[in-house]
């Protein structure tokens, strides 16, 4: 008779302990955002490579722990290439300067860019057949483009322009798909990269500080960095990839000192319509002037920024609030679902998913005041892939002394990165200004969910981007709240006369942008 009671009591005790543990974890997470003071953060760590620079923010800052993100900034010099890597969480990249190319390696997707086999002949020898190259689609990006990187998918980037590419990336370490902890990690497939987030390594060292000599040697190897291939022996790699040991040793890259960003001597040559079009133009010019066409240059020159935007607009699907500026292509107008002509739905969603959108074009603005500035919003409604990432973005340009009126985030934390200089004020639930100061270029500011925030441009204006931790982040503007509340409620709430209430509700701009 006592056994069922004992079993029930034991089950109840386990359930109580589990509930207490979950409550403690949840409470700890909530307490991370009980911040009485916010700080403008600057990069804490730099990794200088052969072809560029990587700057990172310490993820242990209370503000970043509250938002569940960390941030990195990459600078790719001319002909600089960021080595293939992947992350255990999604990331969003905004290009604040320059132009380039990005390639992904989606698992299970075909190589849709192919170079046909060609016959090459040499004097005194028979014709030889060159090996064929093929790879997945390459996407081109420009200044103002927002790129989204799926978790676990390898990608690489390359600077195709003459000026450095500068890109800022929030890393959503608290994403529910990340089965590790919230410490930032980058898994490189090539090179001998340096540690980008030393705080992660420091925590691991503290956890292993009680280990013996063997663990100490292991920690020393971890501090030196390396790609995921460097942990395998060259003999094993040679067997796995069916190659010789010399090639396998280069895959391990034990002595490569170029680090994360390398310089491609002579420029990168890949299969891409954009590369090929420029090469054909160069050959046509040579024939026109009677010159013998030379071999295609390895480093392509590229068209103007407007040409890149036109290409992006052709690839974009029409948005309800932004109709296309040119007619759709015939293949886009054909109805789908006709028997065998229907393409694989999984392939369309994964292999050909749209992963970038320009957010900085003036024609892209959702709010505009010719005397105050403009606002552009990017969320899962305008870029459906963001629904899987749980991120969104907002691009704001404030003209001289222009004001972004007070608002708050209903369902997201936000990370603000500036390109100019302006004043920001954040007020918490107690009516205290947890931040009231100037935000300069290169700094970031984390604003938790619900505190009211307002921005004002300086004498030279203010340009900034806001990353938000929800795929469809919603903001509520205090001016809009005044408009929808009955006059009597406002009169009694603020002790105002009717004329003052009418002035408060209906005088001035109806949108969030204000010119003082």
From Swiss-Prot:
Superkingdom of origin: Eukaryota
Listed Basic and acidic residues bias regions: 247-260, 317-337
Key words of the record: Allergen, Disulfide bond, Endoplasmic reticulum, Glycoprotein, Seed storage protein, Signal, Storage protein, Vacuole
Disulfide bridges in this chain: 33-66, 109-351
InterPro entries linked to this entry: 11S_seedstore_CS (IPR022379), 11S_seedstore_pln (IPR006044), Cupin_1 (IPR006045), RmlC-like_jellyroll (IPR014710), RmlC_Cupin_sf (IPR011051), Seed_Storage-Functional (IPR050253)
ATP-binding recorded as keyword: no
Sites where a glycan is attached: 79
Keyword Endoplasmic reticulum among UniProt keywords: yes
Subcellular location(s) per record: Vacuole, Aleurone grain; Endoplasmic reticulum; Protein storage vacuole
Cellular component aspect of the GO annotation: aleurone grain; endoplasmic reticulum; protein storage vacuole
Region of interest (Disordered), ranges: 113-135, 198-226, 244-345
Tissue-wise expression: Exclusively in seeds during embryogenesis.
Practical use: Emulsification efficiency of glycinin is improved by degree-dependent glycation with soy soluble polysaccharide (SSPS) at 60 degrees Celsius in both the acidic (A) and basic (B) polypeptides as a result of subunit dissociation at the quaternary level. Thermal treatment of soybean seed proteins leads to the aggregation of glycinin acidic and basic polypeptides (GAP and GBP, respectively). GBP improve sensory properties of meat (e.g. pork) during chilled storage and inhibit bacterial growth (e.g. L.monocytogenes, B.subtilis, E.coli and S.enteritidis).
Compositional bias (Low complexity): 117-133
Molecular functions (GO terms): nutrient reservoir activity
Signal peptide: 1-24
Domain Cupin type-1: 38-249, 357-502
Modification(s) after translation: During soybean germination, seed storage proteins are hydrolyzed by protease/26S proteasome.
Biased composition (Acidic residues): 278-288, 307-316
Assigned protein family: Belongs to the 11S seed storage protein (globulins) family.
Functional summary from the UniProt entry: Glycinin is the major seed storage protein of soybean. Glycinin basic peptides (GBPs), and, to a lower extent, glycinin exhibit antibacterial activity against Gram-negative and Gram-positive bacteria (e.g. L.monocytogenes, B.subtilis, E.coli and S.enteritidis) by forming pores and aggregating in transmembranes, leading to membrane permeability and, eventually, cell death.
Subunit structure: Hexamer; each subunit is composed of an acidic and a basic chain derived from a single precursor and linked by a disulfide bond.
Protein name in UniProt: Glycinin G5
Organism: Glycine max (Soybean)
């Amino acid at each position: 008779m006592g056994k069922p009671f004992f079993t029930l009591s034991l089950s109840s005790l386990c359930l109580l302990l589990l509930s207490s543990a979950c409550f403690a974890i949840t409470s700890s997470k909530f307490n991370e955002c009980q911040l009485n003071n916010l700080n403008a953060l600057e990069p804490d760590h730099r990794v200088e490579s052969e072809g560029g620079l990587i700057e990172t923010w310490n993820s242990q800052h209370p503000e970043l722990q509250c938002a569940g993100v960390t941030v990195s900034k990459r600078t790719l010099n001319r002909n600089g290439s960021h080595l293939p890597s992947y992350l255990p969480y999604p990331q969003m990249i905004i290009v604040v300067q320059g132009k380039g190319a990005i390639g992904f390696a989606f698992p299970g997707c075909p190589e849709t860019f192919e170079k046909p086999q060609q016959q090459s002949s040499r004097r005194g020898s028979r014709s030889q057949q060159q090996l064929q190259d093929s790879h997945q689609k390459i996407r081109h990006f420009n200044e103002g483009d927002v790129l989204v990187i799926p978790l676990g998918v390898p990608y690489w980037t390359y600077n195709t322009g003459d000026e450095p590419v500068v890109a800022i990336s929030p890393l959503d370490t608290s994403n529910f798909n990340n089965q590790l902890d919230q410490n930032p990690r980058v898994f490189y497939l090539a090179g001998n990269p340096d540690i980008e987030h030393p705080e992660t390594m420091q925590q691991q060292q503290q956890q292993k500080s009680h280990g013996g000599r063997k663990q100490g040697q292991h920690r020393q190897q971890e501090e030196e960095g390396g790609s995921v291939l460097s942990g395998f022996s060259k003999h094993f790699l040679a067997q796995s990839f069916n190659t010789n040991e010399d090639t396998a040793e280069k895959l391990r890259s034990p002595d490569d000192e170029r680090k994360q960003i390398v310089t491609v001597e002579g420029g990168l040559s890949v299969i891409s319509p954009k590369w090929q079009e420029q090469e054909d133009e160069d050959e046509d010019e040579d024939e026109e002037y009677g010159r013998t066409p030379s071999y295609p240059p390895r480093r392509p020159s590229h068209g103007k920024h407007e040409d890149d935007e036109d290409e992006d607009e052709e690839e974009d699907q029409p948005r309800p609030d932004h109709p296309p500026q040119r007619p759709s292509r015939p293949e886009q107008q054909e109805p789908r679902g006709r028997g065998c002509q229907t393409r694989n739905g999984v392939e369309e969603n994964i292999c050909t998913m749209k992963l970038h959108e320009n957010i900085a074009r003036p024609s892209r603005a959702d709010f505009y005041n010719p005397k105050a500035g403009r606002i552009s919003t990017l969320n899962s409604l305008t870029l459906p892939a963001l629904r899987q990432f749980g991120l969104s973005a907002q691009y704001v340009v404030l003209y001289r002394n222009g004001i972004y009126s007070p608002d708050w985030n209903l369902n997201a934390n936000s990370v603000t990165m500036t390109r100019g200089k302006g004043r920001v004020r954040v007020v918490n639930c107690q009516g205290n200004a947890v931040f009231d100061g100037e935000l300069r270029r290169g700094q970031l500011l984390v604003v938790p969910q619900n505190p009211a925030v307002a921005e004002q441009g300086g004498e030279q204006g203010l340009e900034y981007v806001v990353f938000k931790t929800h795929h469809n982040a919603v903001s509520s503007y205090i001016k809009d709240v005044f408009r929808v509340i009955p006059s009597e409620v406002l009169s009694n709430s603020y002790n105002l006369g009717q004329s003052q209430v009418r002035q408060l509700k209906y005088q001035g701009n109806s949108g969030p942008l204000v010119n003082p």
